[in-house]
Amino acid sequence: MLAKRIIPCLDVRDGQVVKGVQFRNHEIIGDIVPLAQHYAQEGADELVFYDITASSDGRTVDKSWVERIAQVIDIPFCVAGGIKTIEDAEKLFAFGADKISINSPALADPTLISRLADRFGVQAIVVGIDSWFEQETGKYWVNQYTGDETRTRQTHWQLLDWVKEVQQCGAGEIVLNMMNQDGLRNGYDLAQLKLVRGVCRVPLIASGGAGKMVHFRDAFIEAKVDGALAASVFHKQIIEIGELKSYLVKSAIEIRSE
């Protein structure tokens, strides 16, 4: 069994790390490079960087900080934000990214997933999915352009259909960003994760809702996810990564040791 991964997420806007609640009202957390170094030293297994307004602004991720990150950390990192072409991806890999993640551009053109996977290998291509639970209908919908709350829109895709589609197109990993839970710190949506796990053959990463160490444990044990991504609990120093890993080991969860 592969070891479970702990993944701090750094949302980037205008060159700084920010964090919102349910993808809204973002506050500045700090500078990118020192935070990346801090999490790498704390024992993170990998890092994810989202240039959150790149897609909605019609641009690609700001590459200047990608190269700086690659120079100062020695753990894998994934970069997302407005990647629409093979050339966009090539530049990010050249600057040192280990993986790229696509979200809104994949919804606009699902063949992008296949083209990227064919060129760089499925192991390097992550698809991010921003899901919203609609209380009235009990359905999970996929949203697009969520980095800018004024442009966020619901797509015609229901969650499980899109999960199946991106796998057929060549996604090597899926990060499920559960928007209803984002930033609330009251736990991952285990019911949603279990539904997705049932149709997901590739590594599945939970995102949105971590507030306590037990939330990570529950996602790994109950929903059988491969990794857990979190932001505010790490940014606000509510949970320290080393302590979290020790806790998970005591819960009989296989974790990558330092």
From Swiss-Prot:
Main location: cytoplasm
UniProt GO MF annotations: imidazoleglycerol-phosphate synthase activity; lyase activity
Pathway involvement of the protein, from the record: Amino-acid biosynthesis; L-histidine biosynthesis; L-histidine from 5-phospho-alpha-D-ribose 1-diphosphate: step 5/9
GO process terms (BP): L-histidine biosynthetic process
Record key words, sorted: Amino-acid biosynthesis, Cytoplasm, Histidine biosynthesis, Lyase
Active site: 11, 130
Domain of life: Bacteria
InterPro entries (UniProt xref): Aldolase_TIM, His_biosynth, HisF, IGPS_HisA/HisF, RibuloseP-bd_barrel
GO cellular component: cytoplasm
Pfam families reported for this sequence: His_biosynth
Protein localization: Cytoplasm
KW Amino-acid biosynthesis (keyword) present: yes
Class of the enzyme per the UniProt entry, highest EC level: lyase
Catalysed reaction, written as an equation: 5-[(5-phospho-1-deoxy-D-ribulos-1-ylimino)methylamino]-1-(5-phospho-beta-D-ribosyl)imidazole-4-carboxamide + L-glutamine = D-erythro-1-(imidazol-4-yl)glycerol 3-phosphate + 5-amino-1-(5-phospho-beta-D-ribosyl)imidazole-4-carboxamide + L-glutamate + H(+)
Gene3D superfamilies assigned to the protein according to its UniProt record, in alphabetical order: Aldolase class I
EC annotation from Swiss-Prot or TrEMBL: 4.3.2.10
Function comment: IGPS catalyzes the conversion of PRFAR and glutamine to IGP, AICAR and glutamate. The HisF subunit catalyzes the cyclization activity that produces IGP and AICAR from PRFAR using the ammonia provided by the HisH subunit.
Cited HAMAP family: HisF
Family: Belongs to the HisA/HisF family.
Description of how the protein assembles with itself and partners: Heterodimer of HisH and HisF.
Protein name as catalogued: Imidazole glycerol phosphate synthase subunit HisF
